[in-house]
């Protein structure tokens, strides 16, 4: 055999071994745990309090459903936001929530504008699970990305985010916190703004 073929075979074996190792590593770091809130199983990190993590995701999932139902039923009250509400309603029909690794590159993110939302549930400083209200604030941020036709943190995104915050306060699924006056650590980041001022 030529040296070229041997190198290609060795490279192929190394790539297959790497893929196998990474898939095993990923699967061993997370597992599905059933939430006592929704009876759905959520992918959470294999860390202490993983049942609490599934519980939190169940609460968040239920709150998203409350928000979705309210916006769907009352869409005509919010003519200015109607196209964004429609986009929101259409995109989260089959939403999957899961816990992002606390040491991941991103804290929380949305996949395909509403197919999946990964939430960091634990403090990078303490390892403790974050307060549900703080996680809900971050969830509303991610849901604003789902509803917004633009990418990044544009003025339209902020307008939709503020709208979702206000509706969530009215529905009692989020309690307003002035993070500018009382900053909060979230997954190693500091939330220090109050968009309602």
UniProtKB/Swiss-Prot annotation:
Keywords: Signal. Residues 1-30 form the signal peptide. It holds the Pfam family WLM. It comes from the Viruses. InterPro entries: WLM_dom. This is Uncharacterized protein R325. It comes from Acanthamoeba polyphaga mimivirus.
């Amino acid at each position: 055999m030529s040296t070229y073929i041997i190198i290609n075979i060795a490279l192929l074996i190394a790539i297959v071994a790497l893929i196998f190792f990474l898939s095993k590593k990923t699967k061993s770091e997370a597992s599905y745990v059933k939430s006592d809130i929704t009876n759905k199983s959520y992918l959470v990190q294999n860390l202490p309090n993983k049942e609490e993590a599934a519980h939190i995701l169940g609460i968040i999932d239920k709150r998203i459903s409350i928000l979705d139902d309210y916006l769907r039923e009352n869409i005509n009250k919010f003519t200015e936001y109607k196209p964004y509400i429609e986009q929101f309603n259409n995109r989260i029909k089959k939403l999957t929530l899961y816990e992002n690794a606390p040491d991941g590159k991103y804290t929380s993110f949305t996949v395909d504008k509403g197919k999946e939302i990964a939430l960091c549930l634990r403090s990078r400083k303490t390892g403790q699970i974050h307060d549900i209200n703080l996680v809900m604030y971050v969830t509303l941020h991610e849901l604003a990305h789902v509803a917004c036709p633009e990418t990044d943190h544009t003025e339209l995104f902020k307008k939709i985010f503020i709208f979702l915050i206000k509706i969530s306060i009215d529905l009692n699924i989020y309690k307003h916190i002035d993070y500018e006056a009382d900053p909060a650590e979230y997954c190693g980041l500091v939330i220090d703004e109050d968009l309602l001022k």
